[in-house]
Amino acid sequence: MLVYLAEYLTQFYSGFNVFSYVTFRAILGLMTALMFSLWWGPKMIERLQLLQIGQVVRNDGPESHFSKRGTPTMGGLLILAGIFISVLLWGDLGSRYVWVVLFVLASFGTIGFIDDYRKVVRKDTKGLIARWKYLLQSIAAIVIAVYLYASADTAGETQLVVPFFKDVMPQLGAFFIVLVYFTIVGSSNAVNLTDGLDGLAIMPTVMVAAAFALIAYLSGHVQFANYLHIPYLPGAGELVIVCTAIVGAGLGFLWFNTYPAQVFMGDVGSLALGAALGAIAVLVRQEILLVIMGGVFVMETVSVILQVGSYKLRGQRIFRMAPIHHHYELKGWPEPRVIVRFWIISLFLVLLGLATLKLR
């Protein structure tokens, strides 16, 4: 929004031209989201406490989690508000890239909000019925997939980039819609499964978003894109603003979510952030890279799939409890140890993912 005002004011004072630079607006976007989260966080936590919107803890979970009962949840609203305010202020609202991610955040955030509302306000422990949740996620993802396929202007927008291989970018055709669907829905649910310990999901989300900010910047510049053998995507640079807003809002939320947490993000946050990462990966054509950099999310999801599959087929469990972070808790690891070690793994995987841009 302010980019248009700055463009107008440039004719009176050339110094306003600095707002035309994506990097400058990205820094302001990060700072805006961070400062808003730090400012509004205490007020929101107090409000959630007054409304008695507290976390529901499963009785069959680790005993150390019983003390978390009643901790305010639905803090994802804080994250989403910070992102939206920052992007609307500093982003180019004429960019379809920006609106795609905002739509994903809003739609999946709404699904998560309904789920949280049923759990913590209406005291329905099951929340939104799984099939309805999946149906709503599917509708939102398909809408985005069809829109991106129909509006693609260049061949690079529907190619699949394969890490480690130079110029291996097969044209997907209609299969692009399928890939977009599974990337967004899968990423959304993967982050949701990871969000089981204080700060466990938000920090890897911040790391992956920061990495995608760099990738979006490189993809939006023809020289960098050609040098790194990745698709050149005109206008993709505006995604840098979105990514840095996620980083800022995420770090601001982590201030209150770090162990012992004062607030949890709830499904309204985890489903929305996961879907946003999936959408950004799709927009910069780096779905496989998301699997690498978001390896912690993948590990958590696979542990659940293996646990359920093993129990149904063999009647035996592989892990003491799934997702896998609970397995380590039941082995006796203190919660902070599990969290920080998963953060370290996430950092390593993000750096590995970035390294693939050059290792081709």
Swiss-Prot record:
Statement: the UniProt record of this protein carries the keyword Cell wall biogenesis/degradation: yes
EC number(s) stated in the UniProt entry for this protein: 2.7.8.13
GO biological process terms, semicolon-separated: cell division; cell wall organization; peptidoglycan biosynthetic process; regulation of cell shape
Coiled coil start-end: none
Major enzyme class: transferase
Organism in which the protein naturally occurs: Shewanella piezotolerans (strain WP3 / JCM 13877)
Pathway connected to this protein: Cell wall biogenesis; peptidoglycan biosynthesis
GO molecular function: metal ion binding; phospho-N-acetylmuramoyl-pentapeptide-transferase activity; UDP-N-acetylmuramoyl-L-alanyl-D-glutamyl-meso-2,6-diaminopimelyl-D-alanyl-D-alanine:undecaprenyl-phosphate transferase activity
Pfam families, A to Z: Glycos_transf_4, MraY_sig1
Family: Belongs to the glycosyltransferase 4 family. MraY subfamily.
Chief subcellular location: membrane
Domain of life: Bacteria
Cofactor: Mg(2+)
InterPro entries per record: Glycosyl_transferase_4, PNAcMuramoyl-5peptid_Trfase, PNAcMuramoyl-5peptid_Trfase_CS
Identification of the protein by name: Phospho-N-acetylmuramoyl-pentapeptide-transferase
Compartments reported by the entry: Cell inner membrane
Keywords: Cell cycle, Cell division, Cell inner membrane, Cell membrane, Cell shape, Cell wall biogenesis/degradation, Magnesium, Membrane, Metal-binding, Peptidoglycan synthesis, Transferase, Transmembrane, Transmembrane helix
